[in-house]
A protein has these predicted regions:
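Enzymes that bind and transform nitrogen-containing heteroaromatic metabolites
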Residues: 1-128
Length: 128
C-alpha cells in the first residue's frame, strides 16, 4: 500500500508519530517535490516498486499534468447517454492547455465497445 504526501505535510507526521505507525503497518511513503509531487519521480518509484499499470482518477488538473509530462500511454473515454455540465464545469484536461495542434497530444483509437448503455473508446497516446 502506498501513501503520498507533500513535504510540508510530513512535519505533522513527525510531531504526531503517525508516520512511524503507518510504516509499521507496511505503508510506504513517497517524498518528492516541494509543494507538488514530481510526477515523473512518482511514476519511476511506482515502476520500481512493481506497479506497471495505473488507473488515473485524480481529476482534470492531474490528468493535464500527467499528459503534459508524457506520462499517459492510454486514454479510455466513456460516452454515456446523458448530458451534464455547464460553463464552469471541468473538462477532461484542465490546465494551461495546448495552444496549437502541433503542441497538442495526438491519439489513435484502437478499440471501442458498448458497456451497457455506454460506449467505451480506447485511445493510444501517440506523441508522448
Amino acid at each position: 500500500m502506498f501513501f503520498f504526501i507533500t513535504f510540508v505535510e510530513f512535519f505533522d507526521f513527525i510531531v504526531n508519530d503517525r508516520y512511524a505507525n503507518f510504516t509499521k503497518r507496511g505503508i510506504d511513503f513517497f517524498f518528492s517535490g516541494d509543494k507538488r509531487v514530481d510526477l515523473k519521480d512518482l511514476m519511476n518509484y511506482l515502476y520500481e516498486s512493481g506497479i506497471k499499470t495505473l488507473m488515473l482518477e485524480g481529476g482534470s488538473t492531474l490528468n493535464f499534468s500527467m499528459i503534459k509530462e508524457g506520462l499517459i500511454d492510454e486514454i479510455r473515454i466513456c460516452v454515456a447517454p446523458f448530458v451534464v455540465g455547464g460553463k464552469d464545469s471541468h473538462t477532461l484536461f484542465d490546465g494551461e492547455g495546448f495552444d496549437t495542434m502541433d503542441e497538442g497530444v495526438r491519439l489513435e483509437l484502437f478499440d471501442s465497445f458498448k458497456l451497457g448503455d455506454d460506449l467505451i473508446l480506447q485511445y493510444k497516446v501517440l506523441n508522448k
